[in-house]
Curated annotation (Swiss-Prot):
SUPFAM superfamilies: C-terminal domain of alpha and beta subunits of F1 ATP synthase, N-terminal domain of alpha and beta subunits of F1 ATP synthase, P-loop containing nucleoside triphosphate hydrolases. It comes from Bos taurus (Bovine). This is ATP synthase F(1) complex subunit alpha, mitochondrial. Acetylated on lysine residues. BLOC1S1 is required for acetylation. The keyword Lipid metabolism does not apply. The keyword Repressor does not apply. The record marks S413 as: Required for activity. Belongs to the ATPase alpha/beta chains family. The modification Phosphoserine is found at S53, S65, S76, S106, S166, S184. Subunit alpha, of the mitochondrial membrane ATP synthase complex (F(1)F(0) ATP synthase or Complex V) that produces ATP from ADP in the presence of a proton gradient across the membrane which is generated by electron transport complexes of the respiratory chain. ATP synthase complex consist of a soluble F(1) head domain - the catalytic core - and a membrane F(1) domain - the membrane proton channel. These two domains are linked by a central stalk rotating inside the F(1) region and a stationary peripheral stalk. The modification N6-succinyllysine is found at K161, K167, K230, K239, K261, K305, K427, K498, K506, K531, K539. Homotrimer. Component of the ATP synthase complex composed at least of ATP5F1A/subunit alpha, ATP5F1B/subunit beta, ATP5MC1/subunit c (homooctomer), MT-ATP6/subunit a, MT-ATP8/subunit 8, ATP5ME/subunit e, ATP5MF/subunit f, ATP5MG/subunit g, ATP5MK/subunit k, ATP5MJ/subunit j, ATP5F1C/subunit gamma, ATP5F1D/subunit delta, ATP5F1E/subunit epsilon, ATP5PF/subunit F6, ATP5PB/subunit b, ATP5PD/subunit d, ATP5PO/subunit OSCP.
Length: 553
């Protein structure tokens, strides 16, 4: 220890630069040597025990808790993208914090700098600002505490009801479940919309795309589906409950506010989470919102519960991702989208799954929404998402303006796996309906040219017109599956063939009121059995025949 101290003293006493040795320097070195000799002699006089006690005291008193943070500096900032020098060990998609308090996410890891997307207004950041790593990949709060709340893409409450009390958190970019934990779709996810539940049934764990032009009723189908779950969520059976997450991407704030009010009025907000990244939010937040909502839904799926997530809409997420990618100088591809835009949506939608019993038996059902331009379903993003999903509900402007609402094109709409989940009662009544409607559309095109139609063709046209009328349904008025079965039964069994098409809607409303008030036992039997037994069939036939006789009179 003495030799170390001697060496240190000599080093301090020697001149800093060897090239500057002069007479003065030599003189100072002699003085240093003399001082060193004096201090050395003093140390020798001090007892060894005393030296060791002083050293021990110094070592024990030293502050060993050194808090090291890796930091960098902003080289340039603009359009929501910060180029940061430093942060050599930063991870991809790691959250970083700017000196202004704003958060960002590292996306481009380059040799000399890091490309960071900013979650907020980049005017608060200036060149030279310090950026520090947080060491955490972007995560959001999850759990039942979020039900009934409106949050942003990072899970912060934006509804003015105070902070969210959730203690659990999940990363937003989790990997989708593999093949082994999954099981085929087998339970129905009832939307309450006749045209969907009968012709394009959706199962729990399915991905069903809702696609169409703007203002064709895409969001209405999604909202009706959420409202319809009230009949299951008000019960006590956890296996029947379906928790809902609605992700609004790039929409107007007024639209989101109206939607929240509609859900509140229908008493559906208590089992719903709304994740909002509006048009005025930064592009990175619009990109992140679907993944955040998905993580919230996965909490229910992985705890043996059932959840439904609606992405409204993924076209705007793709546009936000394109903006970010181009500003990060990534090479553009078709329609200027980056090369990994397919992966952007596939890694999100693959997280919807029906888990097997060994993994809790939960499910996450996804209803992504895509907006088309002038009905062009062959554009880049629509074809991508169609190929990823398990079917699509195609909405047409032409049908919408004809008054056929929901404006579902039954020919182009398909559900690839949902028929396995359809209830037997609905299969019994709706089995022939899709074929009859397809034949009707085919014949209707030729019927415009000639009046000499045979009886069979006229019958097809007559039935098709009435079934089309029967599938019309008002907004925000979902129906229970047993009520749908009773109404569709009257149509497909030919009881309405003599009724004027203009009177179909009036008949439906009156018939439903009659069945609900007078024949509740029959509806309960259909709901409990899940099928139409011979006894129920005979009873339904009698009810429809008697009611029609009174209705027409």
């Amino acid at each position: 220890m003495l030799s170390v101290r001697v060496a240190a003293a000599v080093a301090r006493a020697l001149p800093r630069r060897a090239g500057l040795v002069s007479k003065n320097a030599l003189g100072s070195s002699f003085i240093a040597a003399r001082n060193l000799h004096a201090s050395n002699s003093r140390l020798q006089k001090t007892g060894t025990a005393e030296v060791s006690s002083i050293l021990e005291e110094r070592i024990l008193g030293a502050d060993t808790s050194v808090d090291l943070e890796e930091t960098g500096r902003v080289l340039s900032i603009g359009d929501g993208i910060a180029r940061v020098h430093g942060l050599r060990n930063v991870q991809a998609e790691e959250m970083v914090e700017f000196s202004s308090g704003l958060k960002g996410m590292s996306l481009n890891l380059e040799p000399d700098n890091v490309g960071v997307v900013v979650f907020g207004n980049d005017k608060l950041i200036k060149e030279g600002d310090i950026v520090k790593r947080t060491g955490a990949i972007v995560d959001v709060p999850v759990g039942e505490e979020l039900l009934g709340r409106v949050v942003d893409a990072l899970g912060n409450a934006i509804d003015g009801k105070g902070p969210i009390g959730s203690k659990a958190r999940r990363r937003v970019g989790l990997k989708a479940p593999g093949i082994i934990p999954r099981i085929s779709v087998r339970e129905p996810m009832q939307t309450g919309i006749k045209a969907v539940d009968s012709l394009v049934p959706i199962g729990r764990g399915q991905r069903e795309l809702i696609i169409g032009d703007r203002q064709t009723g895409k969001t209405s189908i999604a909202i009706d589906t959420i409202i319809n779950q009230k009949r299951f969520n008000d019960g006590t059976d956890e296996k029947k409950k379906l928790y809902c997450i609605y992700v609004a991407i790039g929409q107007k704030r007024s639209t989101v506010a109206q939607l929240v009010k509609r859900l509140t009025d229908a008493d559906a907000m208590k089992y719903t989470i709304v994740v909002s990244a509006t048009a005025s939010d930064a592009a990175p937040l619009q990109y992140l919102a679907p993944y955040s909502g998905c993580s919230m839904g996965e909490y229910f799926r992985d705890n043996g519960k059932h959840a439904l997530i609606i992405y409204d809409d993924l076209s705007k997420q793709a546009v936000a991702y394109r903006q970010m990618s181009l500003l990060l100088r990534r090479p553009p591809g078709r329609e200027a989208y980056p090369g990994d835009v397919f992966y952007l949506h596939s890694r999100l939608l693959e997280r919807a799954a029906k888990m097997n019993d060994a993994f809790g038996g939960g499910s996450l059902t996804a209803l992504p929404v895509i907006e088309t331009q002038a009905g062009d379903v062959s554009a880049y993003i629509p074809t991508n998402v169609i190929s990823i999903t398990d079917g699509q509900i195609f909405l047409e402007t032409e049908l919408f303006y004809k008054g056929i609402r929901p404006a579902i094109n039954v020919g182009l709409s398909v559900s690839r796996v949902g028929s396995a989940a359809q209830t037997r009662a609905m299969k019994q009544v709706a089995g022939t309906m899709k074929l009859e409607l397809a034949q009707y559309r085919e014949v209707a095109a030729f019927a415009q040219f000639g009046s000499d139609l045979d009886a069979a063709t006229q019958q097809l046209l007559s039935r098709g017109v009435r079934l089309t009328e029967l599938l019309k349904q008002g907004q925000y008025s979902p129906m229970a599956i047993e009520e749908q079965v009773a109404v569709i039964y009257a149509g497909v069994r030919g009881y309405l063939d003599k009724l004027e098409p203009s009177k179909i809607t009036k008949f439906e409303n009156a018939f439903l009121s009659h069945v609900i008030s007078q024949h509740q036992a029959l509806l309960s039997k259909i709901r409990t059995d899940g099928k139409i037994s011979e006894e129920s069939d005979a009873k339904l036939k009698e009810i429809v025949t008697n009611f029609l006789a009174g209705f027409e009179a």
